[in-house]
Amino acid sequence: MARTKQTARKSTGGKAPRKQLASKAARKAAPSTGGVKKPHRYKPGAVALREIRRYQKSTELLIRKLPFQRLVREIAQDFKSDLRFQSSAIGALQESVEAYLVSLFEDTNLCAIHAKRVTIQSKDIQLARRLRGERS
């Protein structure tokens, strides 16, 4: 076979493989310890943000119906015994209570942000109620 002259070609910019450090090579060569896999963990705050988005989208009631009904009956007993409630009345009470709590927590969060915090505290709730005129 006749020898042919080789022509010069432009390089494609590929890099030559580099030598691995001894510690990396040792880590790759060593077998994994017992095959125990760590459970997957989300970054701090990621799950909380997902829950916030989920509950902001939803419209269902968040307080369970029967415990709320027992609480209403217990409070009503202090005013008059043997009171009866329509189920629609309990439902209306629960809707209004949850709407009140959501708006209170929104105002409480604003108070915490104003204090340059991200965690709400009892003093934030007290301030929000005081600004609303609910408590002197």
From Swiss-Prot:
Q: Does the keyword Cytoplasm apply?
A: no
Q: At which residues is N6,N6-dimethyllysine found? A: 5, 15, 28, 37, 80
Q: What Pfam families is this protein classified in?
A: Histone (PF00125)
GO terms for MF = DNA binding; protein heterodimerization activity; structural constituent of chromatin
Q: Where in the cell is it found?
A: Nucleus; Chromosome
Q: Which residues carry this modification: N6-acetyllysine?
A: 10, 15, 19, 24, 28, 37, 57, 65
Q: Kindly report the protein's main subcellular placement as a broad class.
A: nucleus
Q: Which GO terms describe its cellular component?
A: nucleosome; nucleus
Modification N6-methyllysine occurs at? 5, 10, 15, 19, 24, 28, 37, 80
Among SMART domains, the record links this protein to: H3
**UniProt region (Disordered), positions on chain:** 1-42
Sequence positions bearing N6,N6,N6-trimethyllysine: 5, 28, 37, 80
What does the UniProt record tell us about how this protein is modified after translation? Answer: Phosphorylated to form H3S10ph. H3S10ph promotes subsequent H3K14ac formation and is required for transcriptional activation through TBP recruitment to the promoters.
Q: For the modification Phosphoserine, which residues carry it?
A: 11
Q: Does the keyword Repeat apply?
A: no
* Keywords annotated in UniProt: Acetylation, Chromosome, DNA-binding, Methylation, Nucleosome core, Nucleus, Phosphoprotein
What top-level branch of life does the organism fall under? Eukaryota
What this protein is reported to do is described as: Core component of nucleosome. Nucleosomes wrap and compact DNA into chromatin, limiting DNA accessibility to the cellular machineries which require DNA as a template. Histones thereby play a central role in transcription regulation, DNA repair, DNA replication and chromosomal stability. DNA accessibility is regulated via a complex set of post-translational modifications of histones, also called histone code, and nucleosome remodeling.
> Which protein family is it in?
Belongs to the histone H3 family.
Q: What is annotated about its quaternary structure and interactions?
A: The nucleosome is a histone octamer containing two molecules each of H2A, H2B, H3 and H4 assembled in one H3-H4 heterotetramer and two H2A-H2B heterodimers. The octamer wraps approximately 147 bp of DNA.
This chain belongs to which protein, by name? Histone H3
Instruction: Name the species this protein comes from.
Output: Ajellomyces capsulatus
Q: According to the entry, what is the taxonomic lineage of the organism?
A: Eukaryota, Fungi, Dikarya, Ascomycota, Pezizomycotina
